[in-house]
Regions:
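Thiamine diphosphate
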Residues: 1-97
Length: 97
C-alpha cells in the first residue's frame, strides 16, 4: 500500500521542489496529497517522455525535480531520458511504480 505521507516527507528531506509526471491509478493518492502540499509543485505532462525533458529544464534552471511515472511509461520515455538527462549528465531522480 502506498503511503503518500511518508513519501512526501522523504521528498521534503531531499529538498525536492517539483514532481513532474503523468498520474495513474497507482500514484493517484500521492498526486492528490502533493496537490494539497505547499512546498512541492506538481507539473503534469501528457507523456512520460515529456517529464524527463521538463525535469531536465527545471534542473538547469536551479530546481530540484523528481520524475514520477508508471513502469510502462519508462519504456515510452527511453529516448527522452537518453537525449536529455543521460546525454546531458543531469542528475534526475525517478520514482517509477
Amino acid at each position: 500500500m502506498l503511503q503518500a505521507n511518508k513519501i512526501i516527507a522523504a521528498l521534503e528531506k531531499q529538498e525536492i521542489t517539483h514532481v513532474v509526471g503523468v498520474p495513474d491509478n497507482g500514484s493517484r493518492t500521492l498526486y492528490e496529497q502533493l496537490w494539497a502540499h505547499d512546498k512541492i509543485e506538481v507539473v503534469l505532462t501528457s507523456r512520460e517522455g515529456e517529464a524527463y525533458g521538463l525535469a531536465s529544464g527545471l534542473y538547469l534552471g536551479g530546481a530540484n525535480p523528481l520524475v514520477l511515472i508508471q513502469n510502462t511509461g519508462f519504456f515510452e520515455a527511453g529516448d527522452a531520458f537518453r537525449g536529455t538527462a543521460y546525454n546531458m549528465g543531469i542528475p534526475l531522480v525517478s520514482l517509477i511504480g
